[in-house]
Amino acid sequence: MKRSVLPLVGTAFQQGKMKEAIEQIQDTDLAEIARGERYYFSAQAGACAEAVKNYLTSEDLMLRLSADMLYAFANLTLGNAREAQMAREDVRNCLQKSLEEDVTDETKAACIFACYLSSIFLHIEPEKGIPPLETCINHLPEGQRLFAVSVLAHGMYLKKEYAKAQGVVQTAMLLSDQVYPIPFIYLHCIAAMCQINQKDQEGAIRSVTRAWELAHADQLMEPFIEYHGLLQGVLEVCLRKSEPETYKKLVDGIIAFSRGWMKIHNPQMNTMVTDLLTPLEFSIAMLACRDWTNQEIAEHLGLSVNTVKHYVSAILEKLHLDAITPAP
C-alpha cells in the first residue's frame, strides 16, 4: 500500500464508522497514525501525542510528517509549547530535505502541505521561499487535497478575502466524488467563518449545522474547538442550548487549546491575543470588534440586549479598556 500523509483525513468513511475504517487499514504503521488522528480530531490530545510520538523520528517522511503535525497540535492543548514548536520545526526540516533531494512530487507536496498547515493554523505567515501550496496541491490524494484546500481558504480568510475563500471551499465540496468527513467538517467551518464575516447569519448557521451532522456520530469535536473564536458565536447559536453537555465539553477544550495556541502565536507574531475571556465573551468581543451593534449581537446569539451589555461591560473590565475598537 502506498503511504500518504494523514491517512484518516484521506478516508471517506461512513458517519459513525471511523473506528471500523481504521481497522481496515492493513499497514500497521499507517493504522497507528490513523489512531492518532482519531484521538486528535475527537479532542483526546494526550492519547494522540502518545500514539504518534514513536514516529517523530521515522525515516518514512509520510509517517514522520503525520506525527509532527498531530504531535504539534496535540501539544497546544496539553500546554506544551516547546514540544509543539519542535514538531513544527521538524516539518520545516523535512521540507528543506525534500527540496534538496530527488523525491517524488507526492512527497514534496506532503511536505509543503504540512508546512502551510503548521503555520496558517497558528495565523503565522509561512516562511519566504516555501513553494506555493496551490502549485502542488494536485499531487495530494483527494481527501488530503480537500484538507489542503481548507488551509488555502483559511489563508484567504486571514487576508479578509471572505467571498473568495467561501467560493473556494464550497466549490471543492461540490467537485468531490465522495464525502470525506474530516476535511468536509473543516471546509464547512471555514465557509461559516466567511459567511458570518459577511453578516450572512443564516448561511453560517447552515454551514456549522452541516459540519456538526458529519461530526457528531464520531464525536469529532476538535475542528469546532479550533475554529470557535473565528466562528464568532455561530457555535453558541447551534449548540449552547440544544446540546448543553456537548457545548460544555467544547468549552473545556476551547480554553485549553486557545491558551496553548497563544503560547506560540503571540511570541511569533509579536501580538497579544488574550486568554482572559470565556469562550462566549470572546465571541461577543469578536462581533463587537467587527462593528456589530449590541442589538445585532443579541439577535444573533439569542440573548437580550441587556445581557449583551452586561457581557460587554465585563469584557471591558477584564481587558482594562474604555471601549471595544472596531477592527481595521
Residue ranges of model-derived segments:
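Glycine-rich, flexible loop segments associated with nucleotide phosphate handling
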Residues: 106-110, 273-277, 326-328
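Short, amphipathic alpha-helical "recognition" segments used to contact nucleic acids or chromatin
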Residues: 286-290
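Solenoid-like repeat scaffolds
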Residues: 22-29, 53-64, 89-106, 131-145, ...
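Recognition helix of helix-turn-helix DNA-binding domains
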Residues: 273, 291-328
